[in-house]
């Protein structure tokens, strides 16, 4: 696989899509914007309010904003509700499956609980959120019926003002993709939390529970539907909270774990302990939720 060149991936710019025209192209389809959130009381409100004002009230493009609160210890749920989102606790969605953990769990449950035929996911910690992110992600799906998954990418300035791809992306995701999944090397931001897809495709994918979900979905959608069914869109510039390195090591471990798991399940154990000098050890588990298409009571797509 080392000699396999990166495949081309259709690439768009958010600015090339007009929201009024997208309303016409949308037809009878419903669009849900879902935000997984944990302890994001400072940013989730403005994000929800901006989507609601621009894409529900000014232009009727989005039908639903759903925030799945992933065990927040602050006022994330209340702030999101006041801003106009439908808010559900992760624990109240599919409780018969037990309490999972992490971002992937929240995404999986948001897919179950939402009503849209097209799903847009955005991170809830973005400080300069622009509703154009949603327009850019949904635009290719409405313009090109052959696409099933659209990944966002952006300029991401670091604390020095220079644009970077993110530390975990540059130090872990990009190298492991180049080594094990070189056909995906054209994906600019493989760990970006902004992406969209058709329910009929997403409901057939397993969801890694934790931080590995972003990369896991890229790998799995490409394997099932092919790169011709995928695209990426330039969302411009995005600023979010920069976490200290000790908070990034669990994410880096989960991303590496997911990549190795997808390459060959026998390469890793189902559970690993991240040991860091001077800090408490953290267990990182390779756990995934099943495709929703097989979950009893799930609202299936019409496809």
Predicted regions and their residues:
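Short aromatic/hydrophobic "clamp" motif used to bind/position activated sugar donors
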Residues: 119
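Acceptor/aglycone-binding surface of glycosyltransferases and processive sugar-polymer synthases
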Residues: 95-103, 107-109, 129-201
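Conserved catalytic loops of nucleotide-sugar-dependent glycosyltransferases that act on lipid-linked
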Residues: 164-258
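N-proximal low-complexity "stem/linker" segments adjacent to membrane-targeting elements
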Residues: 1-53
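A conserved acidic beta->alpha catalytic loop
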Residues: 69-78
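Terminal low-complexity segments of carbohydrate-biosynthetic enzymes
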Residues: 1-6, 243-303
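The conserved acidic donor/metal-binding loop of glycosyltransferases
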Residues: 123-129
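Conserved donor nucleotide-binding strand/loop of the catalytic core
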Residues: 63, 77-105, 113
